[in-house]
Every structure is written in C-alpha cells, then in structure tokens.
C-alpha cells in the first residue's frame, strides 16, 4: 500500500504558510490491513483510521456518488483498486486536489502529484472546482467562501461561480443543517478577512438564503456625517474586518456582524436616519441565533451589543447614574470580562468607518474606570447594615455605586 499527504497540507506548503492539519490517503489497502498495523478505525460513513503513534487521520482512497439532496446524500466506494487520481477527483477545488507520497519514516518524498493543475491555480490565485461533481455538495459553497476569507487575494473562477449560483437556484443550499452553516460561518469569521467570505456568499446568492438578515444591509444608506462609507453593508464588513485585525474573539466578531441588523428594516421614508434600530436589531437577532443554533456565548454578547452600542458611543455625555444603569442592564457588574468584549465590539463599530479606523475611542477608558469604581462598592457590607429589606438594600447599593462612579470620574450624579 502507498500513503500520500493530500489536500490543504500540500496547498499550504506550496503557499509557504504554516501547515495546521495533515490529511492522509492510503491507496491499495483494506480496513483489515489497516487495523492489523495498529490503526484505529473512527470513520462512520467511510474508513478513516487514527495512526497508532501520531493520532493523525488516514483515510482509505475512495470515490463517491450523489444519492440524495444535501451534504449527507452520498454513497462511498472504497477498495484497494481505487487510485489516488480517483480519490483526488472527488475533491472540491484544484488547489486542494494535490498530493505527495509519504515515506515509511513519515517524510514527504517525490514531486507534487497534481492531476488537475492546482499549482497553476495557486500561482494565479484562483479558486476553481475540480469537476462538475462540485454541485453535489452544498457545503462546498460555504467552504469556498471561508477560503476567500483566509486567502483574501484569491478570486473565484467564473465557471465555478456559475456552478455555485446554479446550486443556490436549485435549492441545494437550503438542505444544509443549521449547525453546519454556523460552523462554516464561525470558521470564516475567525479568518484574516471575514468580509471576503460574505462577498462570495453574496455574489452567488447564498447569503440571502442562509442569513437574509445580513444580506438585507447592502444598499441601505446611513448618514454620511456619521458614516462616510454610507452603505450599511459596507460598514458592517468594515467593522467585522477591524475586529478580525485586532484578533478579537469569535463572540466579538459575531456581534460586529449583527449589531446593525435593524437598519435593514428601517422604513424607506426615514432614511438615512435609523432611529430605534437597536431594538429592531435585537428582535431580528433572536430568531437568527435560534435558527443557526448559535452558541450561548456568541448569542448573549451579540444581543447586548445590538441593544447597547448606541448608548456606549454616547457615554461621554452620561452622568454617573446613567452609567450605573448601563452596567446593570448589561450585567457588567457580574460579568466584567463580557463587558470588556462589549467595549471591543463597540470600538470596532466606531472605527469600522471609511477613514476613521484610527480615530480615538475615549469611551472605552471612561467605561473601564467607571466600572472599576462601581465594582469597588462592598454590597455585602451595605446589606449587613440594612438587614432583610431587599428593596432598601438594592437602592442603597445602587446609590453607593453612583457616588463611586461620580467620584472616580469627577462628574455629577
């Protein structure tokens, strides 16, 4: 039997970027031969094995045939006579359909095996499908979009984009389960240039099907004195890219993506103003998170950011009492780490605007100082001094926090 390193590892090696994961294909072997050599079977739909020492995945060479809609609708064929070229032919993109042989010692040996000219597409910075079988797996639309966020200088080949549009028009994208959609969006958000993912999804029509709330933002104008970029969709992409550039968490990046959803439903007769868009954003965000099964950490931060980002931008005008009420609404007193992420998302919002990516955001430091002062109040000591009257305790603690914030910032209550 022969072992080959395939896919992303070869692509990344040729691009000169760090190889994160290695996938291996075994040609000429049976499952019984693999287990006899100590490999542990883990695949459900087709034979995948873990190496006894490295725990890396090794899959038997296989072909696949579409049998039903969606990305689960495949029948796999694996046998010792399946060739490497046949295995590579089922892959999505030419740049992922390359291989190199692996020696018994585990080293890569020999030339790059490249039956579909993936190296030429790497040099041209092009995402190109291997064959028309690309249309059989709708996940590939999301994967190309995610790759675009990682390799921002690549473009999608015209013929590949045409196939993606056909898949969307045929309803293939609608067969994806929510968890897989979220998984790919989340991975794309964590890449260097998330806006490229959404550009590709918009270009093929997929974004309107999987996250219509975000797709609706393009073409919606904002006031140019606040938003020189004007277009809401452009603004949101700038915010997400700023958050990515700063290395912020997935929760912050998702909050950046969804903070202005309500602007997509602003009545046309009041544009470019967006009074009340924060509450509309919250109402759109709740079902979106439920539909995509967004994890609680990302959902909860996104809801707070959507509701409060306008208030955070205005904190320089707030008195101490208003600041404490903001802390109470956002649960900052109990969850200061999440409040720090709220600040990151709002800073990204302020700087994700044309020509304003380096503008000062003094609101963040003011809120950090104010929150530290509010949290310094000993609520337990106040409670012990009052007794069992819950309402009196609550009022006294609130007053003490207001006074502490006023003193720390040298402002009125």
From Swiss-Prot:
InterPro entries cross-referenced by the UniProt entry: CCA_bact (IPR012006), HD/PDEase_dom (IPR003607), HD_domain (IPR006674), NT_sf (IPR043519), PolA_pol_head_dom (IPR002646), PolyA_RNA-bd (IPR032828), tRNA_CCA-adding_enzyme (IPR050124)
UniProt GO BP: RNA repair; tRNA 3'-terminal CCA addition
Any Pfam family matching the protein: HD
Keywords, comma-separated and alphabetical: ATP-binding, Hydrolase, Magnesium, Metal-binding, Multifunctional enzyme, Nickel, Nucleotide-binding, Nucleotidyltransferase, RNA repair, RNA-binding, Transferase, tRNA processing
GO molecular function, one term: CCA tRNA nucleotidyltransferase activity
Domain HD: start-end pairs: 232-333
Function statement: Catalyzes the addition and repair of the essential 3'-terminal CCA sequence in tRNAs without using a nucleic acid template. Adds these three nucleotides in the order of C, C, and A to the tRNA nucleotide-73, using CTP and ATP as substrates and producing inorganic pyrophosphate. tRNA 3'-terminal CCA addition is required both for tRNA processing and repair. Also involved in tRNA surveillance by mediating tandem CCA addition to generate a CCACCA at the 3' terminus of unstable tRNAs. While stable tRNAs receive only 3'-terminal CCA, unstable tRNAs are marked with CCACCA and rapidly degraded.
Additional comment: A single active site specifically recognizes both ATP and CTP and is responsible for their addition.
Assembly, per entry: Monomer. Can also form homodimers and oligomers.
Name of this protein: Multifunctional CCA protein
Organism field: Burkholderia orbicola (strain MC0-3)
């Amino acid at each position: 039997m022969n072992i080959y390193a395939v896919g992303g590892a070869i692509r990344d090696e040729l691009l000169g970027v760090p190889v994160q994961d290695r996938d291996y294909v075994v040609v000429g072997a049976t499952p019984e031969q693999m287990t006899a050599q100590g490999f542990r079977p883990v695949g459900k739909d087709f034979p995948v094995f873990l190496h006894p020492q490295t725990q890396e995945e090794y899959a038997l060479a296989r072909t696949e045939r579409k049998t039903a809609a969606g990305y689960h609708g495949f029948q796999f064929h694996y046998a010792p006579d399946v060739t490497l070229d046949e295995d590579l032919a089922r892959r999505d993109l030419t740049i992922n359909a390359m291989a190199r042989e692996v020696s018994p010692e585990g080293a890569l040996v020999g030339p790059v095996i490249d039956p579909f000219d993936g190296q030429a597409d790497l040099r041209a910075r092009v995402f190109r499908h291997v064959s028309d079988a690309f249309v059989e797996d709708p996940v590939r639309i999301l994967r190309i979009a995610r790759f675009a966020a990682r390799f921002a200088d690549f473009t999608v080949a015209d013929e590949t984009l045409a196939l993606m549009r056909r898949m969307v028009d045929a309803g293939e994208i609608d067969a994806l389960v929510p968890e897989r959609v979220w998984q790919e969006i989340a991975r794309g958000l964590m890449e260097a240039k998330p806006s490229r993912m959404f550009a590709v999804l918009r270009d093929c029509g997929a974004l309107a099907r999987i996250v219509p709330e975000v797709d609706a933002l393009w073409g919606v104008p904002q006031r140019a004195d606040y938003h020189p970029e004007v277009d809401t969709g452009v603004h949101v992409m700038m915010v997400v890219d700023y958050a990515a550039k700063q290395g912020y968490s997935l929760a912050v990046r998702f909050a950046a993506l969804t903070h202005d959803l309500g602007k997509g439903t602003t009545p046309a007769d009041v544009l470019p103003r967006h009074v009340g868009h924060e509450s509309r954003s919250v109402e759109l965000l709740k079902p979106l998170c439920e539909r995509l099964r967004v994890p609680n950490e990302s959902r909860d931060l996104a809801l707070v950011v959507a509701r409060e980002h306008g208030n955070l931008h205005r904190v320089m005008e707030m008195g101490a009492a208003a600041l404490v009420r903001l802390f109470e609404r956002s649960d900052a007193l109990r969850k200061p780490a999440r409040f720090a992420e709220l600040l990151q998302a709002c800073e990204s919002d302020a700087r994700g605007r044309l020509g304003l990516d380096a503008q000062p955001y003094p609101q963040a430091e003011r809120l950090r100082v104010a929150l530290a002062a509010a949290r310094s109040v000993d609520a337990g000591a106040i409670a012990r001094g009052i007794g069992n009257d819950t309402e009196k305790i609550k009022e006294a603690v609130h007053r003490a926090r207001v006074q502490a914030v006023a003193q720390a910032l040298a402002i009125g209550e």
